[in-house]
């Protein structure tokens, strides 16, 4: 990409660092995950969790949510100012599951936010360690991406449910910073912008006054983030139009929806990082591993290696399939909800099935579910190979626009062709090419029409044996083309509701 010189790498965004060399980046990412691990160990001690209970992914999620809530400044301020019945603004908590005489019991715990903040800072050398918090947010976001469908959210903003592959990071909180912006899909950014424009249409003071000026700055910043994800001049030029609009309205919404559709073939660059549950880092730290000294990367072999030797458990409902639960968490760990299933299956070494065929609900257990019948099982999070995570959309010929697939945003940098039904996508582009953006629209449609599904993406890139940590011998898989690659086909997942 043209602006590569000024871009910071993921790890720099992740750790809030300026330009660093590879070793410094590995050390600062290591420091970040090491801090998460130390915090987790301390919380397990506070809560007197047994080793088994500390490895339970549901307990890990509760502890992660507590620290995110403790540091959520805006929400804390809001709760202070709008006291609601039964919510103590100074406390945070959630369900902790314990093993009692052969059964799992749920215990609701409550902690002072101040106390949680103290434990977190203490684990992070006295710093706020915002990077670690963002890392946890991205893990939760990746879990949501693998678990829930966003059809309703798409339809509400006037987008097509078939654009689900563009929705990575749609549940990330606004405060997730540069690292969060990097992992958001094109559809997510479009949706945020459309919501903003709609508010402006309905509330005439939205863009006015001192507040309106701040709103405008946020609007332009979001436009620039989205523009940076597009890889063709015409798509970027359209984003400039949207950003510079005096009074954003329906014309801009139309343009944004057009751009979102175009991203199904002319894919945007969206970052992928393997963010693991806090308990995994905790286990490693407890076993004496020094992340900062060894260094760590979110996009290389490290997360794969960590998962090879971590045993994590999950609660299982009576009619759920433990193997399916494992697949869900594996996909979340590697940010692979939008990856081609052929590629995921090859790397994992076991068949990864579409979500419609999974016999499992989400990982979290609702407070009204019956614990009597709950069982637990080991999550199988190991893989056969590892591959480098990508931050490109996998477009061919010199990273310019080319073949895409109606439902894939590649996670792994592995050679494959991108099957897509051009007719299906092009049908969405009939008609409207008039207006200010007509020449750009025409250009985008022309590029899409010339895309060939048989083109190969990530030419020559392969997966690596887990013993090949320096990535010296790429194994380039050959894929059976007849297979449909999308996780979302025949989808019957629950909607994501806050």
From Swiss-Prot:
One of its GO terms (molecular function) is structural molecule activity. Disulfide bonds: none annotated. Keywords: Capsid protein, Helical capsid protein, Host nucleus, Host-virus interaction, Ribonucleoprotein, RNA-binding, Viral nucleoprotein, Viral penetration into host nucleus, Virion, Virus entry into host cell. It is found in: Virion; Host nucleus. A motif (Unconventional nuclear localization signal) lies at residues 1-18. Encapsidates the negative strand viral RNA, protecting it from nucleases. The encapsidated genomic RNA is termed the ribonucleoprotein (RNP) and serves as template for transcription and replication. The RNP needs to be localized in the host nucleus to start an infectious cycle, but is too large to diffuse through the nuclear pore complex. NP comprises at least 2 nuclear localization signals that are responsible for the active RNP import into the nucleus through cellular importin alpha/beta pathway. This is Nucleoprotein.
